[in-house]
C-alpha cells in the first residue's frame, strides 16, 4: 500500500470514528435528514414549474392535471402561482427541520467531545503533562473541537442536502432526456480527481494550522500566567514579538489554505460551466419536437446543478480540517491512562512507610534521579529530606502517591507495595502540600473542602483553618469563608495561600502527610504558628518533610541528606551536626545549597 493510500485509509477511519459521536443524537439527526430531503426535493419542482409557466404563456387556459379528479379544471393561469407558493412553503419547512435539528446535533457533539477530552486530561499520567505543551491541550478543547464539529455536522449537512439536490436533479434530467444527461455525467471523473487532489492539500495545511493555533494559545497562556515576571523583568517587548510571530505564522498558514481554495474553486466552476455550455449547444441543436417549456425546464434544472456540485466539492476542505483536528483529539483520547493494576483497598492505614532499594529514571531519559534509596518511617515519625536542588527530594515525594511509577525497588505502605493499592484508595491516605500552591477560582471554604472533601461540615472546615492559623486572616475578610480567592488565589498573599493549602491537608486527615517546602512562603510569625499546628497534626501520622529552613526540620526523628539521587547521610539533627559532614555544611549556610560532596 502506498503512503497516499495509507493516509486515505487512515482519514476514512478517523472520519467514521468521528461520526460515531453522532450516534447518541441519532433520533434528532434523522429528523434533520428528513428536513434536508424535503428541501432537496423542491429543486426539481422549481425547474418543473417553469415548464408549465412557459407553456402557459402560449396557452394560459390549458389545464395542469387533466386526468386527476377535482384538479382537472385547474388552469395553468391559476395553478402555477399557487404551486410556487406551496413549493416555497415546503422548502421552508425542510430548511427549518434540517438546520435546527442539525444545530442541536452539532452543539451536542461539541459538548460530548469537550467533556470527554477534559475527563481524559484528569486521568492522564504525569509524564504526559511533562512532555505536552499546555497551550496545545487547551487549543484542542477549544479550537480543534470546533473544526471537528464542522466536519461531523456542517459537512454532513452539505453532503446530504446538496447531495440529494444533485440526485433529484439528475433523476429529473434523466426522465426528461437521458441521452443529454449522460453527456453531463462525463465530467464527474474529472471533478473527482480535482476534489481528491485538493483534499490532500487541505488536510496537510489544516494540521499545520492547528499546531500554529496551539502555539498562539501557549504563548498567550504563559504570558498571562507569568504577567508579574514579564513586568518585573521588562519582558513586554519580548512577549509582544513572540506572540506576534506565533500569530503571524498562524495567519500565513490560514492564508495558504484560503489560497488553495481560491484557486481550486474557480477551476472547478470552469469545468462545470464548460459542460453546461456543451449541454446548451446540444439542447439547441437537437431540440427535436420538445416544447419551449421542456427546453427551459431542462436548462433550468441543469443550471441548478453547478451550485450544489461546487458546495459538495468545497466540503472536502471542511472535512479535511475536521479530520486533521480529530486526529490530534483522538491521539489524546488514545493515550494510556495512569496505570492502576492494584486491587487492595483499605479504609484506613496506620501510615507505616518503608522504602527499599528504590532507584528511578524519568521516562524517555537516561538520567538516574534516585539511586538505591532505603529508609523506613513508623506512624507518628517525621522524616526530613534535605539537600541541594536536583538531589531527588521532590521526585521521591512524587513517587509515594504514584504520580510517577517506579520499577526498581519497593515502596511499602503498611507492608503493602503501593502499586498493589487501587490508585484512588492509595491517594486517599496521603495529604500533600507543595511549595507552589494551587487554589481554584472559588470561595475559601470550597478551596479547603476540595474534591472528596466537598460537603464537609462548616465546623470542620473552620477547625482545619484554625489549626493552620488561617482563620485569623479569613475572619478579617468581608465575606469570611465565602470570599472568592480569584484565579489561583491571586487575591491572597503567598503566606495566606500556603496556609489554605495546609488547612486543606489538615481537613483531609490522612495518615501520611507530605510537606514539600510547605512553609517556605510564610513569614517568621506565620511559620511559628504553622509549626505549632504541624507538631499537633503530625502526632500519629507519618510525615515526610522537604524543607530549606532549619526550624522546619530540627525536630525531625530522622533527617535524610540527599545528593545526586543518593542518601549521603542520615540521623537526627544533633547526630548529623556531630558528624561535621555534608549536613553540617548545610547547617552552617542556613540550609542554602553548598557545593556537591567532594568539592573543595
Swiss-Prot record:
Residue ranges occupied by any ABC transporter domain in the UniProt entry: 353-589
Entry's localization field: Cell inner membrane
Main EC class the enzyme belongs to: translocase
Keyword Glycosyltransferase: no
Domain ABC transmembrane type-1: residue ranges: 30-321
EC number: 7.5.2.6
Membrane topology reported for the UniProt record: Multi-pass membrane protein
Family: Belongs to the ABC transporter superfamily. Lipid exporter (TC 3.A.1.106) family.
Entries under NCBIfam families matching the protein: MsbA_lipidA
Quaternary structure (record): Homodimer.
UniProt function note: Involved in lipopolysaccharide (LPS) biosynthesis. Translocates lipid A-core from the inner to the outer leaflet of the inner membrane. Transmembrane domains (TMD) form a pore in the inner membrane and the ATP-binding domain (NBD) is responsible for energy generation.
The protein's name in its UniProt record: ATP-dependent lipid A-core flippase
Native source species: Pseudomonas savastanoi pv. phaseolicola (strain 1448A / Race 6) (Pseudomonas syringae pv. phaseolicola (strain 1448A / Race 6))
Amino acid at each position: 500500500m502506498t503512503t497516499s493510500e495509507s493516509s486515505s485509509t487512515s482519514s476514512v477511519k478517523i472520519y467514521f470514528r468521528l461520526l460515531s459521536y453522532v450516534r447518541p443524537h441519532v433520533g434528532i439527526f434523522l429528523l434533520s435528514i428528513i428536513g434536508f430531503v424535503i428541501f432537496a426535493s423542491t429543486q426539481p419542482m422549481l425547474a418543473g414549474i417553469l415548464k408549465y409557466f412557459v407553456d402557459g404563456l402560449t396557452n394560459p387556459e390549458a389545464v395542469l392535471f387533466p386526468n386527476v379528479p377535482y384538479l382537472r379544471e385547474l388552469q395553468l393561469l391559476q395553478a402555477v402561482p399557487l404551486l410556487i407558493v406551496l413549493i416555497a412553503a415546503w422548502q421552508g419547512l425542510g430548511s427549518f427541520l434540517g438546520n435546527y435539528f442539525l444545530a442541536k446535533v452539532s452543539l451536542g457533539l461539541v459538548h460530548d467531545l469537550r467533556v470527554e477530552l477534559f475527563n481524559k486530561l484528569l486521568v492522564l499520567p504525569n509524564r504526559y503533562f511533562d512532555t505536552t505543551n499546555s497551550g496545545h491541550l487547551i487549543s484542542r478543547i477549544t479550537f480543534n473541537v470546533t473544526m471537528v464539529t464542522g466536519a461531523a455536522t456542517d459537512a454532513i449537512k452539505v453532503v446530504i442536502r446538496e447531495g440529494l439536490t444533485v440526485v433529484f436533479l439528475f433523476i429529473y434530467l434523466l426522465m426528461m432526456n437521458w441521452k443529454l444527461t449522460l453527456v453531463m455525467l462525463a465530467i464527474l471523473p474529472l471533478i473527482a480527481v480535482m476534489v481528491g487532489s485538493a483534499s490532500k492539500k487541505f488536510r496537510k495545511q489544516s494540521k499545520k494550522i492547528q499546531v500554529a493555533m496551539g502555539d498562539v494559545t501557549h504563548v498567550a497562556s504563559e504570558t498571562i500566567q507569568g504577567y508579574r515576571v514579564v513586568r518585573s523583568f521588562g519582558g513586554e517587548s519580548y512577549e509582544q514579538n513572540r506572540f506576534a510571530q506565533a500569530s503571524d505564522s498562524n495567519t500565513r498558514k490560514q492564508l495558504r489554505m484560503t489560497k488553495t481554495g481560491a484557486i481550486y474553486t474557480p477551476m472547478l466552476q470552469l469545468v462545470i460551466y464548460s459542460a453546461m455550455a456543451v449541454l446548451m449547444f446540444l439542447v439547441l441543436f437537437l431540440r427535436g419536437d420538445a416544447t419551449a417549456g421542456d427546453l427551459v425546464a431542462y436548462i433550468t434544472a441543469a443550471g441548478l446543478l453547478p451550485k450544489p456540485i461546487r458546495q459538495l466539492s468545497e466540503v472536502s476542505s471542511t472535512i479535511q480540517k475536521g479530520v486533521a483536528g480529530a486526529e490530534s483529539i483522538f491521539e489524546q483520547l488514545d493515550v494510556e491512562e495512569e496505570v492502576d493494576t492494584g486491587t487492595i483497598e483499605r479504609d484506613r492505614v496506620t501510615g507505616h512507610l518503608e522504602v527499599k532499594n528504590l532507584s528511578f529514571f524519568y521516562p524517555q531519559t537516561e538520567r538516574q534521579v534516585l539511586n538505591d534509596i532505603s529508609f523506613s518511617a513508623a506512624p507518628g515519625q517525621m522524616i526530613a529530606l534535605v539537600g541541594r536542588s536536583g538531589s531527588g527530594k521532590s521526585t521521591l515525594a512524587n513517587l509515594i502517591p504514584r504520580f510517577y511509577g517506579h520499577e526498581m525497588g519497593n515502596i511499602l505502605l503498611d507492608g503493602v507495595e503501593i502499586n498493589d493499592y487501587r490508585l484512588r484508595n492509595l491517594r486517599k491516605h496521603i495529604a500533600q502540600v507543595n511549595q507552589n500552591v494551587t487554589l481554584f477560582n472559588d470561595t475559601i471554604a470550597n478551596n479547603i473542602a476540595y474534591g472528596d472533601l466537598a460537603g464537609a461540615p462548616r465546623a470542620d472546615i473552620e477547625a482545619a483553618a484554625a489549626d493552620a492559623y488561617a482563620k485569623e486572616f479569613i475572619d478579617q475578610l468581608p465575606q469570611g469563608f465565602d470570599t472568592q480567592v480569584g484565579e489561583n488565589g491571586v487575591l491572597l498573599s503567598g503566606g495566606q495561600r500556603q496556609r489554605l493549602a495546609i488547612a486543606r491537608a489538615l481537613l483531609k486527615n490522612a495518615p501520611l502527610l507530605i510537606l514539600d517546602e510547605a512553609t517556605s512562603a510564610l513569614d517568621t510569625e506565620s511559620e511559628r504558628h504553622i509549626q505549632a499546628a504541624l507538631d499537633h497534626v503530625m502526632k500519629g501520622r507519618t510525615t515526610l518533610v522537604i524543607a530549606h529552613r532549619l526550624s522546619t526540620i530540627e525536630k525531625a526523628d530522622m533527617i535524610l541528606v540527599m545528593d545526586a539521587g543518593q542518601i549521603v547521610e542520615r540521623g537526627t539533627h544533633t547526630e548529623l551536626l556531630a558528624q561535621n559532614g555534608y549536613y553540617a555544611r548545610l547547617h552552617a549556610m542556613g540550609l542554602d545549597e553548598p557545593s556537591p560532596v567532594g568539592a573543595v
